[in-house]
From Swiss-Prot:
Record's protein name: Homeobox protein CHOX-CAD
Keyword Nucleus: yes
Composition bias type Low complexity, residue spans: 201-211, 228-240
Alphabetic keyword roster: Developmental protein, DNA-binding, Homeobox, Nucleus
The entry's DNA-binding region: 137-196
Pfam family, one: Homeodomain
GO biological process, one term: anterior/posterior axis specification
Main location, first listed in the record: nucleus
Gene Ontology MF term list: DNA-binding transcription factor activity; DNA-binding transcription factor activity, RNA polymerase II-specific; RNA polymerase II transcription regulatory region sequence-specific DNA binding
Organism field: Gallus gallus (Chicken)
Family as reported in the entry's similarity comment: Belongs to the Caudal homeobox family.
Function, as annotated: May play an important role during the early steps of organogenesis.
Keyword Nucleus: yes
Annotated Gene Ontology cellular component terms: nucleus
Length: 248
């Protein structure tokens, strides 16, 4: 093969397997070569000699058909010259980005990023302030009707621990879930234990207060006599010592 400044050194093409392709540019035949660039004798040939199927110029254009097709999409940005042509040029510049990538860049504006959380906060503030209950209480707290409480109380007096079968039947009859029936029975048993504990405390308090209290000091006893406990306090057997003090 003939050396050429356009050919990549790693490419090896055989002229026997070469099939010439259509020219990429309409004015390609009128291009004028500059003689004396290097020692290649084919650079000095006229433009008409390029029409032969095994000339180096057409082989170069066929081997770099992909790069020429990408350069043809933007013909105003490039000026073709064989010594300056580089097959790696489309990957170096930032202006040859795909249209999808370059078009998506202006959509990410800082105003759109700041606007989204602000609108989300504005929508969430009225929802939290309007309702006094939290999500957990709204989800799990159930307000039973009078009919439901009556039927549940009847079942509780019959059996403090409801069976699985009866729980399913009662939930279907009252329009509740089995979990709601189970929670009601758990709360009802806890309430019963609390009431029984309070009753036991009330029963133990009167027994401790029935012990007799001793009579007060100085109270008259039966037959108009004084209590024995009041005698020592009235008559004192110890002599009184009087200390006289004189002023000088």
């Amino acid at each position: 093969m003939y050396p050429s400044p356009v050919r990549h050194p790693g490419l090896n093409l055989n002229p026997q397997n070469y099939v010439p392709g259509p020219p990429q540019y309409s004015d390609f035949a009128s291009y004028h070569h500059v003689p004396g660039i290097n020692n290649d004798p084919h650079h000095g040939q006229p433009a008409a000699a390029w029409g032969s199927p095994y000339t180096p110029a057409k082989e170069d254009w066929h081997s770099y058909g992909t790069a020429a097709a990408s350069a043809a999409t933007n013909p105003g940005q490039f000026g073709f010259s064989p010594p300056d042509f580089n097959p790696m040029q489309p990957h170096a510049g930032s202006g040859l980005l795909p249209p999808a990538i370059s078009s998506s860049v202006p959509q990410l504006s800082p105003n759109a990023q700041r606007r989204t959380p602000y609108e989300w906060m504005r929508r969430s503030i009225p929802s939290t302030s309007s309702s006094g209950k939290t999500r957990t209480k709204d989800k799990y707290r159930v307000v039973y009707t009078d009919h439901q409480r009556l039927e549940l109380e009847k079942e509780f007096h019959y059996s403090r621990y409801i069976t699985i079968r009866r729980k399913a039947e009662l939930a279907a009859a009252l329009g509740l879930t089995e979990r709601q029936v189970k929670i009601w029975f758990q709360n009802r048993r806890a309430k019963e234990r609390k009431v029984n504990k309070k009753k036991l405390q009330q029963q133990s308090q009167p027994t401790s207060t029935t012990t007799p209290t001793p009579p007060a000091v100085g109270t008259p006893g039966p037959m108009g006599t004084l209590c024995s406990g009041s005698a020592p306090s009235l008559v004192s057997s110890s002599p009184l010592t009087i200390k006289e003090e004189f002023m000088p």
